[in-house]
Amino acid sequence: MTDAPPTTGLHHVTNVCTDMSETRAFYEDVLGWHTVKRTQNYDDPGTPHYYFSPTPAGEPGTNVTYFEYPHGRGQPGPGASHHFAVGVEDEATLQEWRDHLQAHDVRVSDVKDRTYFKSIYFSDPDGLVFELATTGPGFDVDEAAPGSDVIDPYDQGYAGDGDDDGDDGGGH
């Protein structure tokens, strides 16, 4: 451990989209999230900055925010985010989400077994990869102390099929 001051966890995550109305429709109509704040980028006045949350009040730690840059395109690689994961209670809920996403014409992966949890993957309108992951049994039962074991997914038969880039229904 270090002598770093404590933190309380993630406050929010900010991404970039090319069309805020399309992003807002995705969060509200497909994911069922709430638009909890509409403002502008404080460092780039005039650039829309929206906050979305699965909770009506948008408590810290639940917000995903977006800046709108219509002509901006990121690329995968160092310094870029690969995906972000949102928890669901159990495998039944994960399957409900898979069915729900397919009903909204969202390409979604099969359920992936990730040793500690199970997941599905899909992308938003700009290609940002989402993961929905079960909460258990997971981290509290697999090791004596968190981070004490190294799991090799190839040795244990959990490795992906290489179809995990998010643009074709895969995504990790």
Residue spans for each PLM region:
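Short beta-strand/turn micro-motifs at beta-sheet edges
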Residues: 1-3, 69-75
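Catalytic cores of nucleotide-enabled group-transfer and carboxylate-activating enzymes in metabolic
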Residues: 22, 31, 36, 63-64, ...
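Conserved beta-strand in the GNAT
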Residues: 63-67, 131
